[in-house]
Amino acid sequence: MKKMALIYNPVSGHALFKEKLDTLIELFQRHDIILSSYRTRGNGQDQLSQFLCEIAPAGILAAGGDGTVHAVVNALQDAKIDIPLGILGSGTSNDFATHLGIGGDWESYVERIAADESRRVDLGVLEGQGRYFVNVLSAGVLTGIAHEVKSVYKNSLGRIAYYLKGIGELPRLHSFPVHITADGEH
């Protein structure tokens, strides 16, 4: 049997993923894949890296929103682990999963994972900070919006909660210089 790590955020989105957990486990077991679960705890990335090193999974499934994906990507890089990462978007926006066309039918998604289907995506790094990203690198006034919006508003308003918070920050906008290097070119 193949072993995969399931890293899930119990409060992302409407905190509904927990209700679907047994269904997900059963789908993977049909394909002889055992899931070892890890429940995220805010800033517990060091513990997440340790967990991944200890169980040595063949792959990882991140269930949560874009913040969960970000935490898992950074834990993988911190621990120098190079294994496939699957995403089950269960957050408020799930921008990255949506961009990749991941979502909806879990059964066919699990079948693709069991068949070792994957694709490569670019991994960015913020030099000097040692932080990695796969979806968005942002800077400036609007960067904290995702973290500043209270869960109660995200759960009741969804994406609109982010937009409303962003509108409130517009008077504070200002420009600043940025230097970008991509594929070795400035």
Question: Where are these predicted regions, by residue range?
Answer:
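ATP/NTP phosphate-donor binding region
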Residues: 1-63, 70, 75, 107-111
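Helix N-cap/beta->alpha junction signal
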Residues: 64-65, 138
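Catalytic core of DAGKc-family lipid kinases
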Residues: 5, 38-40, 78-186
